[in-house]
């Protein structure tokens, strides 16, 4: 389906399946509705190859690459916390931020943004290969051009990020 939004042309695809068994499996394994999505527990103990494939699929579909920043936005905070945990398993530090919905959409859910910046975007780009070609080309540029050796906002000690504790 091709549509124009704010002067931009967007292409979207829809996949429909008619299997009660598959629907029940996906509902139990991945959650229901946008705000109910999550990373299944099995993914956290999976081999790195599986984790890289899951991150590839998620960011190829719902992520974006702009400059040296890789990001994803969701109304499901628990989904992005799971993605953040999977990224940490491959040595990539991510930040999470809550974003209030626009006043134009008073019934919209709170949005959550996961960002990978600094040298962690280079680590991510060197490990995760995207199936979406345009995003992969942008990741290749991060690997080729990024000279960042550490994150300017966070100190590290060995492989531990020393981010501030905001509350307990």
Task: Annotate each predicted stretch with a short phrase.
Residues 1-168:
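Internal intein/HINT superfamily modules and their associated LAGLIDADG
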